[in-house]
UniProtKB/Swiss-Prot annotation:
PANTHER family: FMN-DEPENDENT NADH-AZOREDUCTASE 1, FMN-DEPENDENT NADH:QUINONE OXIDOREDUCTASE. Homodimer. Its EC number is 1.6.5.-, 1.7.1.17. Its cofactor is FMN. The gene is azoR. This is FMN-dependent NADH:quinone oxidoreductase. SUPFAM superfamilies: Flavoproteins (SSF52218). GO terms for molecular function: electron transfer activity; FMN binding; oxidoreductase activity, acting on NAD(P)H as acceptor; oxidoreductase activity, acting on NAD(P)H, quinone or similar compound as acceptor. Belongs to the azoreductase type 1 family.
C-alpha cells in the first residue's frame, strides 16, 4: 500500500486554491487505498529558524530546553518524511517565492549528517527512494520564466536531501479573470489525475 505525505502551506485555509487541488488528489488516492498523512504547515506552524535553533540542530550535551524541543521536532519531521513513499508539497507562490511556513519545514528537515551529508565529491542526499509531487498555484503566469523561483528552489532542496524524482503540477493565471482561473484549476486537476492513474 502506498504511503503519501501531504504538506499544505497556504495561509488561506478553506479559500486556498492549492488546498482544493490537494483535496482533489487526496480523494483519488484514497479511492485506490493509499495511506495518507496530512501536515498543514499554516494551521500548525513550525518554529522559524534562528541562531539558537540552528545551533541546537547540530546537537550537543548542553542544549537549552528550546533547542532540545527543536531537535526532537526536527527528528520527528525527518522520520515522518522517511516513513512515506510519496511526498506532496502544495506550494502557492507568494511574492515570487514559497510561503514562510514551508520554508520553516525545510529548515528543520535539511540537516547535515541526518538528511544529507558532505563527501569528497560534494553533498549527498540521505533520504532516497522517494518521489515528490509539487502542486504550485499562482495568480499570474510564471512557468519556466525568470520569475518562477518556487519550482527550481523546491527541486534543488529535494534533490539535496536525496529526493530526485519530482513531478510538478502548475495551476496558473488564477487572478487573471474567472475564465482563466477556471481553466487554471481544471488543467491542474487533469494533470493530478494522470499522476494517480
Amino acid at each position: 500500500m502506498s504511503k503519501v505525505l501531504i504538506l499544505k502551506s497556504s495561509i488561506l485555509g478553506d479559500y486556498s486554491q492549492s488546498g482544493q487541488l490537494v483535496e482533489h488528489l487526496k480523494q483519488h488516492w484514497e479511492q485506490q487505498g493509499a495511506e495518507i498523512s496530512v501536515r498543514d504547515l499554516a494551521a500548525e506552524p513550525l518554529p522559524m529558524l534562528d541562531g539558537e535553533i540552528a545551533s541546537g540542530l547540530r546537537g550537543g550535551d548542553q542544549l537549552s530546553a528550546r533547542q532540545e524541543q527543536a531537535l526532537l521536532l526536527s527528528d520527528s519531521l525527518i522520520q515522518e518524511l522517511k516513513a512515506h513513499d510519496t511526498i506532496v508539497i502544495a506550494a502557492p507562490m507568494y511574492n515570487f517565492s514559497i510561503p514562510t511556513q514551508l520554508k520553516n519545514w525545510i529548515d528543520l528537515v535539511a540537516r547535515a549528517g541526518v538528511s544529507f551529508t558532505y563527501t569528497e565529491t560534494g553533498p549527498k542526499g540521505l533520504i532516497t527512494g522517494k518521489r515528490a509531487v509539487l502542486i504550485t498555484t499562482r495568480g499570474g503566469v510564471h512557468k519556466g520564466g525568470a520569475s518562477d523561483h518556487v519550482v527550481p528552489y523546491l527541486k534543488t532542496v529535494l534533490g539535496f536531501i536525496g529526493i530526485e524524482e519530482v513531478e510538478t503540477v502548475y495551476s496558473e493565471a488564477l487572478n487573471m479573470g474567472p475564465e482563466a482561473s477556471k481553466q487554471g484549476i481544471e488543467s491542474a486537476q487533469q494533470a493530478l489525475e494522470k499522476i494517480v492513474a
